[in-house]
Amino acid sequence: MKRRILLVDDDVAVLLTLKAVLEMHDFDVHTATSVSDAKTKLDTGSYHMVITDMRMETETAGWQVVQAARAQKYRPATAILTAYPPPDSNWQDRGAQSLLVKPIGTRDLVRQIEALLVNHEDEKQSQSLDRSLQATRADFPEKNNRKVS
């Protein structure tokens, strides 16, 4: 199954180039050129990952895309793609799981995307197992309170 990526950038040349590169590496790539376009696609589709430029309509437009992605029930992996990395490391605190700095070579880009997708899926599975375990414990409260001698 191809992994679906939403790629968001207001520079159409960058968008089309990255789309072609990622499709050559067997990703199903959808594109958006603005925050509002990205939000619409996030609400109507389902993506494994969202990669967004940080600076589009505003200097913080990318963060709006990340927040919209993180609000989705399907919880896609999120990455900021920028030529202007933030001076501090608060990009993770703001919801992005990866920071991709332009220019970036094709090999490095694909490697970082693959690694992020693997880590993200592992985290989602771990969280799902934790929820299942908590639900099981809630179903059997008397066993949880038993003392072991």
Question: Over which residues does each language-model region extend?
Answer:
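The short loop immediately C-terminal to the conserved phospho-acceptor aspartate in CheY-like receiver
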Residues: D11, R55-E57
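Two-component/phosphorelay signaling modules centered on CheY-like receiver
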Residues: V12-H30
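Acidic, metal-coordinating helix/loop segments flanking the phosphotransfer/catalytic sites
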Residues: H30-M49, E57
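Short amphipathic alpha-helix used as the core "switch/output" element in two-component signaling
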Residues: T40, T60-R75
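Alpha4 helix (beta4-alpha4-beta5 surface) of REC/receiver domains from two-component response regulators
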Residues: Q64, A71, A83-V101, R107, ...
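Hydrophobic/aromatic residues positioned on beta-strands within the core alpha/beta folds
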Residues: A79-L81
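C-terminal output helix
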Residues: I104-A115, E121, Q125
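CheY-like receiver
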Residues: N119-S149
